[in-house]
Amino acid sequence: MVNRQLVSPKSIVIVGGSDDTKKPGGNTLKNLLDTHYSGELFVVNPKADSAQGVRSYRRIEDIPPVECAILAIPAKLCPDTVDVLCTKKSCKAIIILSAGFHEDSPEGAELERRIAQRCNETGTSLIGPNCIGVMTPDYAGVFTHPIPKLTRQGAALISGSGATIVFILEAAMQLGLNFSQVFSVGNCAQIGVEEALQYMDESYEEGKSSKVIMLYIENISDPWKLYRHASSLIRKGVRIAAIKAGYSEAGSRAASSHTGAMASPDKAVDALFRKAGIIRCYSRNELVTVASALMYPTPKGKRFAIITHAGGPAVMQTD
């Protein structure tokens, strides 16, 4: 479930934030500062009283109530930290950047299960683990670069792969594409592509929400939910382009080792996308190109011209 505290938090704590911008916690803090996050900002670091000029608390128990927490600490420390945040600090949104969970080992899967259970019990939104974070017009809660221009009517991006987000942002920014929201869902312990899409459907406002949504999917855990909300958005005038990776046998194995994704038969994926109206793409460059084109109004009628420097590109454009 995606809530207001995840999308527009009034206060954020970086657990594991530091002066070291080569580490996820330190660079996430730097990104928040560089993009002028306007809410209250705290750090938890047992070895520091401040980080990049922001007050740091030695223990999670010492912080004031906070709306959103970004965790960049070892996986084994996350469950107890989440317990304190959810039960004692009124925290309703948690982003876990750390890896070492379901994608790594049975022991990691148990840590992830405990975290998801606590978040579900307390009505807390959970992104990750094993992700790069979240970006909205209100904050850039990620440890990566680049940070795109974030506007409410830019394209939205939901991805199970953090590195794919970085590639897409770099390519899209060269084409002048702006973004409204970026969700790196990682292992999808609670919120996956389907749940993020549900949020975009249920919060859609004509003239204010994104008209283009980009998806990178490794696992479709709830095909009906994906279909229901994708088709609903498309009926509202939103256009959706998606990559479903892991469609080959070898790719499916790679997806499983990456985020713990389960295989989905490729013919079923094709049928689902066609029925919903999702445009399927097969590469990151194709996804960026398609999304950039979709940002323009839909051409009407048959008075359409193609101008190129040579014949071959004209033939391909005609196709």
Across the structure, where does each feature detected by a protein language model lie?
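Catalytic-core regions of core metabolic enzymes
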Residues: 1-319
